[in-house]
């Protein structure tokens, strides 16, 4: 089945198109992004159960972006009050106040050109087997409870076994003078984890996740994920400490993805090029890896949780080759940063929610597959480690 596009947004579209036309008389550029996303979050352990109709990506609202004389401003609202004429007048009034404050405080703002607005009409509904808003939550809680109980029996020294999941049916609509874009897709994530002490009393917690562009059917994979926890727990309980030093390592796809995202990906988010906060700008066209290393970034790279059709600035999703056989070719870029740098946007302008500013953010950051088998790679290492699985990886930085 297709993830159905929001009837609410379809009903809102005519008034928003009228709003854009009204504001277009006062500004050099006008667009509006509207979202309507529904879903759930679920957590089940031996001691607690939690079910919520909200998660990090459930939302409903709109944000207007305008440009005049090189200055961009935004106005966000949850519901469209009154007539488009009244809202247009309120937006003009509020944004003029913002500009007055900037003038009074002497804030130096970026002067940016007008965003391109090539004509485009796009409607995308992605495939899913089930919808989060129609999921039988009672049955899902019962299933997770049974899995938690099974985990307690399977995993040695388990003090608890927890399962968490979230699923969201996302609808987004982008309207400008010449563009009318609509998309809907479902993404789902689930994790099972067990907790238990080693002989020194340190808590070890093996975990395994499932995720993808699809509905709650993805959570069916948690049964197999749970079966992997006992072996991992046994290895964690018996693992010794590594003697500090330098070693050759082989990384599994999970660790390789972590390195690609945290150690490299953030450094080529090009809004940081604008602010001179990223070393990546100094390495474009230079060697940053071996001939075997080619890396892609983009929502089109894989049907994962970020496999959208267009980003939050109305730019179509892309597949960017960031590293080509070891040479850094480019980074990723939101639309405004692209204008300031004189490059093309890559479809990576993302908002935490509709009311937040769009930043350059990653989607799928992946290495191309190589030609060598794992056994060959292991045979090439005299002494080292095979790294599998991670517990964290957040690079702390301020946009």
Place the predicted regions along the sequence by residue:
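Active-site bordering "gate/hinge" segments
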Residues: 1-308, 315-318, 324-327, 385
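Dual-mode signal for accessory low-complexity, basic/Gly-rich regions
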Residues: 283-399
